[in-house]
């Protein structure tokens, strides 16, 4: 397997209860997350040069400070062999909109490279890595509508939402 293509969904917070402020600057919250049908598209192509290259029309993605690069770098450090990747990014989720585009991209990168590089990390391990990247990244690794508390990444329980028919 040399290539993986992913769709990175956006999310909305159905409700958001802001609680107390923590010593680390974050606020404790309670929220319900809903995945929505707006997607960024990422294509991962492995190579053996240990370079992480991001290709996008969005120039702000072409540096080492974005969540896609951070996610790839964290997994690359777990590799015993040369592993590089070219990541093509097509953005559809509006930047800075609160829809979780950067977090979704980070989570998709973790999941895709775990498979592409055959790291065999389980979901719990990926969520642990995700929490070091951003507060919403674990939700996207979890991949289902969920309730969150703490800074949003502390615990997730599956949230069942009513359908149009119920």
For each feature predicted by the language model, list its residue ranges.
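Conserved small/polar residues in nucleotide/adenosyl-binding loops
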Residues: 157-163
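ATP-binding N-lobe of GHMP and related small-molecule kinases
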Residues: 1-97, 115, 119-124
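Gly/Ser-rich oxyanion-binding loop with an adjacent helix/lid
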Residues: 81-152
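Glycine-rich, charged/polar anion/phosphate-binding loops
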Residues: 27-29, 150-156
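Short glycine/proline-enriched turns and hinge-like loops at secondary-structure junctions
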Residues: 25, 141-142, 159
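Generic helix-packing signal
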Residues: 75-76, 113, 134, 161
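Conserved beta-strand-loop-short alpha-helix elements that form
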Residues: 166
């Amino acid at each position: 397997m040399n290539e993986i293509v992913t769709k990175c969904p956006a999310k909305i917070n159905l409700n958001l209860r802001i609680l107390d402020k923590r010593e680390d600057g974050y606020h404790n919250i309670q929220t319900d997350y809903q995945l929505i049908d707006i997607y960024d598209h990422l294509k991962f192509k492995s190579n053996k040069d240990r370079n992480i290259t991001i290709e996008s029309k969005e120039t702000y993605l072409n540096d080492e400070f974005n969540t896609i690069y951070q996610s790839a770098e964290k997994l690359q450090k777990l590799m015993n062999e040369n592993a590089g990747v070219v990541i093509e990014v097509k953005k559809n989720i509006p930047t800075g909109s609160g829809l979780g585009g950067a977090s979704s991209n980070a989570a998709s990168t973790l999941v895709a490279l775990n498979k592409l590089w055959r790291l065999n990390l389980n979901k719990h391990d990926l969520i642990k890595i995700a929490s070091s990247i951003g507060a919403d990244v674990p939700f996207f690794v979890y991949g289902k509508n969920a309730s969150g508390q703490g800074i949003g990444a502390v615990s997730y329980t599956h949230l069942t939402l009513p359908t149009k028919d119920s």
